[in-house]
């Protein structure tokens, strides 16, 4: 019958509510608020069919104000912001413009591009212009970055310059250093260099996505070939994997030593990494001998660990290989299980896409909210809401001279707008629940198919038809509530971990040692709890697929079964995981080496096809990580197969004794590994033997 019906009902209601949440967010949200920058009046820059259609860049009247601490609080710069068609390309001040305007009318035509729309009075006194904020007091050579005008910084011989100048006029009669501009730019961009790296990385993805996709397809084909070979030659192939990894790591040690030796004696190669600090060009680190020494030492430690594990666990490795051979036979009988990860991937992609779209629409919900921005530390109106239409006539401008009524964010006073943050948290929690349910559904489906293989007395004759489809149908029809229950427990723990990570990020600058220590302990505890729940859920789903009981009963039975066989679990299961991990490393490593030679233009045949990149390691790391995840998806089928067969084997040992009435269901190879035998039936008469021969026919 159905298990955990109450949780199933709650799960269905939550899904319906999630659909309603997405619909409401879609009705209220506007992704343009995320895509386009917004000026001080809440208008989009660059939006078609608006006055700003040809003005796609945001310009700051006084970017020096962006170094104010209020930027960190309000995420807005306390100065007027306008949409412009292009950034200024020269130094100029309003005072100099007025002086030259008497001789050259063209100076005003250029300067007024950066004034408020409709303002056309270059003779207006500078004091009144700055009071009414009709025009900026100065402009500096800038370039667009993230659709915003930022000073065009260039470092020449270690000196920071803007348009080959190290100083400028600030429009108030003072000479300022361009370092002040950099500090202001950093205040609003939150580490401009990091964002520049992000832009270059995005450009690299845009130019190399096709080749990244080819690399991932190659890794998928290699993974499939690896699994097919494993079906027939598990022992030989895995020993080749082991020695292949040892050889690859050994080559890495030799290559690092060769690079380390070749850098000896070269100028500046003995500089330490701490001396040069963080560099956006990672090729700088490859010119340091210390970098290659660290690589060589790390690889040597990895090599030693692998060799020691093989020496002390060689007998257990043989047992694990035999268990994998049995798993290979099971997958050979149910080949459709190899392609089930595709279903899981599509379901996960659907969950991720729905969550991301809902999050964007929630973030872009609401009307424009304006707040008072002031550079005066004692202004009591700072950060309060205001109306830009009536702000100039209010008392705020008198009590806080120079204050601005600036667009802050999109929000509102309705019940929906007040609880957008709570809705975002709900969006995240339900997303985690759906993702974990999808993974649980896959695990239970595979476990049911492999359990059907194990409990077939005559393999493959007694295996039911379409075991994977049957297991999938049973899991959805009878055990949706149990799978949702286990997924919910795991999702809550993951949700708490995300909150702890957020708090840790916010408290990085705190000096309270006890708070940091407590937070670190909580993160460690919940990390351990998450991994324990994942392990128990996996085995609980196997028990559900075998006995069809509810989640709590299955989890309890699985836990005590594993505790009664803790040594077998600790050795056999983990050695199997280790061997599969080596296979993932070999696949991702070999595809990664191929990608390295391709993106560094070391393959002459296709050298001209390589796109021009800012950082070749961007597509390289993407291919390596993607290859590892693809191999991980395919090998998860094997891991689930081995775990299911192993759990079934433990149950077989406890429920049966090898007698004629209770024979072992395990195959002969597993019985040989553990020295177990089925008792022979006593000698029978010819008639009895004849009846015995006819017995299988009677079962059908």
UniProtKB/Swiss-Prot annotation:
| Catalytic activity of the protein | choline(out) + n H(+)(in) = choline(in) + n H(+)(out)
Q: Which GO terms describe its molecular function?
A: antiporter activity; choline transmembrane transporter activity; transmembrane transporter activity
Can you cite an annotated GO cellular component? membrane
Record field: compositional bias (Basic residues): 677-692
Q: Where in the cell is it found?
A: Cell membrane
One example of a Gene Ontology biological process annotation:
choline transport
**Transmembrane parts of this sequence:** 5-25, 210-230, 234-254, 293-313, 342-362, 433-455, 483-503, 542-562, 578-598, 617-637
Glycosylation site residues: 157, 164, 383, 395
Entry keywords, A to Z: Antiport, Cell membrane, Glycoprotein, Membrane, Transmembrane, Transmembrane helix, Transport
Q: Region annotation Disordered: residue ranges?
A: 676-700
Protein's membrane topology? Multi-pass membrane protein
InterPro entries given for it?
Choline_transptr-like (IPR007603)
Q: What does the UniProt record say this protein does? A: Choline/H+ antiporter.
**How is this protein named in the record?**
Choline transporter-like protein 5-B
